[in-house]
UniProtKB/Swiss-Prot annotation:
Name of the protein described by the UniProt record: Protoporphyrinogen oxidase
InterPro entries hit by this protein: Amino_oxidase, FAD/NAD-bd_sf, Protoporphyrinogen_oxidase, Zeta_carotene_desat/Oxidored
Organism: Bos taurus (Bovine)
Protein family according to the UniProt entry: Belongs to the protoporphyrinogen/coproporphyrinogen oxidase family. Protoporphyrinogen oxidase subfamily.
Known pathway: Porphyrin-containing compound metabolism; protoporphyrin-IX biosynthesis; protoporphyrin-IX from protoporphyrinogen-IX: step 1/1
Amino acid sequence: MGRTVVVLGGGISGLAASYYLSRAPCPPKVVLVEGSERLGGWIRSVRGPDGAIFELGPRGIRPAGALGARTLLLVSELGLDSEVLPVRGDHPAAQNRFLYVGGALHALPSGIRGLLRPSPPFSKPLFWAGLRDLTTPRGKDPDETVHSFAQRRLGPEVASLAMDSLCRGVFAGNSRELSIRSCFPSLFQAEQTHRSILLGLLLGAGRGPQLDSALIRQAQAERWSQWSLRGGLETLPQALHAHLTSRGVSVLQGQPVCGLSLQAEGRWKVSLEDSSLEADHIISAIPASVLSKLLPAEATPLARALSTITAVSVAVVNLQYRGARLPVQGFGHLVPSSEDPVILGIVYDSVAFPEQDGSLPGLRLTVMLGGSWLQTLEARGCVLSQELLQQEAEKAAATQLGLNEPPSHCLVHLHKNSIPQYTLGHWQKLESAAQFLAAQKLPLTLAGASYEGVAVNDCIESGRQAAARVLGTEPNS
């Protein structure tokens, strides 16, 4: 009788793990268990009354690097090539990104010329930040906060404006608490290997497995900055679900896991609300803190490490305006914490993906709210009403983009504990977990956004590598 692998969590990580398990030459029996009634996790696309697409979670995927190429390969394997909407390298959404500082939008400099001349909100050309990086010695600490690293290597302005904003945009987090080693491993490794971020990124480019497909070649030739799918990014988890069903994978929805216990023969018992499953191996693609509450007493040290990997909430407000125009054309803008503790940034959805605008002319934006403001309100037990979040989002659109008319359509969603926080020393938590799993020979593999990357590409790769480890194949092949 073959092995049974139970995958916990039907977000993109769990779906990817199940997909790669099911495609093995001699696949195990795979059971995917999802607690909610829908698959896809935070990836969710909603169609408005006029057919416009609103993304409640991620809205674009980067094609760059080995992970970006692997996701494009997955898209092709699922037969979705014709659904891809690319943002090509010459498009304003690829070339223009902004910071909102001092009550105004400022274009981030790009190209050599942009680095050599003063570019507000920075007081001097960013060339000097690059020169500082080239002359700064390598750091000696095994980890460092993003703010400390950026200030040491690139200067206080880059740290407090650019990197602060980037941490808010990617992690909805605080650059003074987040780990450079875990949040931006390529920057950390560049310094460790080449003593310089710039040298490391230049000399380290192109490493990793070279994947090939028509879609990958097209993305490289046209220098895509990101891509989406015609019907929204939720098309990807929907296609994965259809594929899994066709391969005989058992997909259980609306079945929250109540507990995990080890049987005498070393198999797992997965307790659901009204039934239970047995598994030879578990891939957990649920949040680390959730898993920590399900583990048996024998895994208390592991549970303790996982419980310290916390996550923050983010509010996403989708706004649609009729007949409105943006003051600038680009991907969107980020807001440093010193400027506005409420607003993380605004994405100009209609610029990147006008094909998703719907039948009537209109402008789609996504306002992201979170950070310390949201954390403080949550800590006080305040009720975060849809009215409050919509009011703050509309105020930001008016103040920062001049959109003073009320929106024609609005969606408000508060994603509770949605983005894991890789705080200083996160790598030690992962090392501790890995050492415990190896020492105890527990048939458990960890996957998902809690560990080594929160982007869609990272989550898909996390699921793929988890499947490879269970199958005993080479994760990098």
